[in-house]
Curated annotation (Swiss-Prot):
The gene is aroD. This is 3-dehydroquinate dehydratase. One of its GO terms (molecular function) is 3-dehydroquinate dehydratase activity. Involved in the third step of the chorismate pathway, which leads to the biosynthesis of aromatic amino acids. Catalyzes the cis-dehydration of 3-dehydroquinate (DHQ) and introduces the first double bond of the aromatic ring to yield 3-dehydroshikimate. The keyword Electron transport does not apply. It comes from the Bacteria. Pathway: Metabolic intermediate biosynthesis; chorismate biosynthesis; chorismate from D-erythrose 4-phosphate and phosphoenolpyruvate: step 3/7. GO terms for biological process: 3,4-dihydroxybenzoate biosynthetic process; amino acid biosynthetic process; aromatic amino acid family biosynthetic process; chorismate biosynthetic process. Gene3D superfamilies: Aldolase class I. It is an enzyme of class 4 (lyase). Belongs to the type-I 3-dehydroquinase family.
Amino acid sequence: MGSIVKIRDVKLGEGIPKIAVPLVGSNEEEIMEEIAGVKTTKLDIVEWRIDYYKYVEEVEKVKKLLQKMRKNLNNIPILVTFRTAKEGGKREISLEYYIELNKAIAATGNTDMIDIELFAAEDEAVKKIVEELHEYNIKVIMSNHDFHKTPHKDELISRMCRMQQLGADIAKIAVMPCSTKDVLELLSATCEMKCKHNDTPIITMSMGTLGVITRLAGETFGSALTFGSAKAASAPGQLEVNELYKVLKLISAYR
């Protein structure tokens, strides 16, 4: 049994992988429409991808919309993510604003988790961001995304262990495979993390059509969360959420 992180009524790191659905609307109307749709799906967590939100550089608008989302989502956990352009996101912002924005979001009390990128800054600065978010009882998913390649297994493990050392509650890595061997590399790293470095739950995925199996086999290999789309996918290879749920349940039933 590895580490378990509880967010409201959701336990990450236990049993069937949980499902997060990203919201990728560019304005309030689109986002609230997405929320109305996702509440009827088989999800566990809602991820607000604020890099898609056109007013993301206006903190007060972000906070106001987050408050409205929290009210509408009832007890569904919220993960807020600003994905930087260099890791596949929609836009780039300064490091200073990245820190300011995430701290302001944490201080509202209207989110449960915040994604912080491993390579957002130097290690000490990233560690400090995590410590400050923890002061608001926020769970931190520390992440790294490579949309071009799959690093060697040892490098994947090294990055996830580094996330744990910097205070992450959950370590996440997503990579792009160029071959089936790359997919196996990711699955092997996931399995080794689960068996030897289970200080935190982990989230891993191999993106694109080649890597779809990694979004389904988390219970077997050790990935605690998978991402499904309700409308538009936020990453290549994401499956429709209700179809994803059916497959996860089927796999779990035969374990």
